[in-house]
Amino acid sequence: KLKLKEGQLLIGLCWRTSKQSFHDLRVEDLAPLKSLRDVVFLAVQYDDCLSELDQVRSLGLPIHYYTNVDQKDDISSTCALLGACDLVISPGTAVFQLAGSLGVPTIAFDAFKCYFDKIPWYPTVRELELNPDKPSLLINEIINEMPEIIGWANAVTTSGRYIDSYSGEL
């Protein structure tokens, strides 16, 4: 069981699709996220990612993962994990679809942005464009805009949990 300190955010992190395409982030792209303070990351990657998690951790980004949850075939447990998150970051996968369906504030990224800030059928999903040649731009945008993202997440959350106590600084 994850225990968060007061003011910490739980961010669910999915960095790639199962088919591994240009819509994905690479493990090394995630390293700058370690600059975010008062954040706990939870891997919500729905396939075997244990070796990638070792790589992520070796880059200095602590991330939790529940090995006892089959995030691909046990939808109810996956939804419980996603529902516990204050924010989810994911490419265009089932993870973002489930989080959006649950009303969890979600940053969805894709190489082809739909050219509207929010997806009409998922009002708690904000879409950001991923430049496959420069994925660091997306990560830097998330890091630099985290206070605004928190404000947006508080405005759209349907969980009733507000994360305005976040005290992280860059």
Region roles according to the model:
Residues K1-L170:
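Catalytic machinery of carbohydrate-active enzymes
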